Amino acid sequence: VCTVEHLMASLHMAGITNVLAKVDEEIPNVDGSAKDFSELIKEAGVEDQGVSAKEAVVLAPIQVGRKKLAEKHLYVEPFEGFEVKMRIDYSAPIGEQELTYNFAHDSFDIDIAPARSFNTFENIDLAQKTGTVGSGYLDSHIILHDGKVINTDLRFPDEFIRHKILDLIGDLYLLGYPLRGRVVANMTSHGYNQALVQKLHVALTT
């Protein structure tokens, strides 16, 4: 099943630990954000099943990659609550951005869920020519070309890093438990996020 991370991020931040999702081979990408999923979950409501949910409690730092500013890396460390600190640095119009999302103090539905996927026109054009994405891809991404956003207005000045945090939160849902810890990420992608989940799973089961 493809494009699951936005739905998983909404489920994660809604505190849902027991859910059955019936889907086709791909989750609808809608507008490239998690906004619609979060709104539908809120509209449907969440049932308290009367059983305390287990937590994945980080007791010691776990790391993927080397802690160097110029290299992709991320790590998780003990923290009372859930927090994500992210840094990205891409060519214009994105540049260097840093942002912290704290579950207790920030609103996922307002601050993170509306942030959309982004890609370059060149990457999208190539993918369409090779048939790996359809025309609807253009409506679900912020498209970048020649140092500019060419197809939409940004919802936030730093929408790009907000979406990277959204993706990371969705990938962490693969752990199967709410995470109690702080995740610090530098220029990471799904591969690094999922590698951290695998390391966390090993630490929790050994």
What residues fall within each predicted segment?
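C-terminal regulatory domains involved in ligand/effector binding and gene-expression control
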Residues: 1-17, 22-206
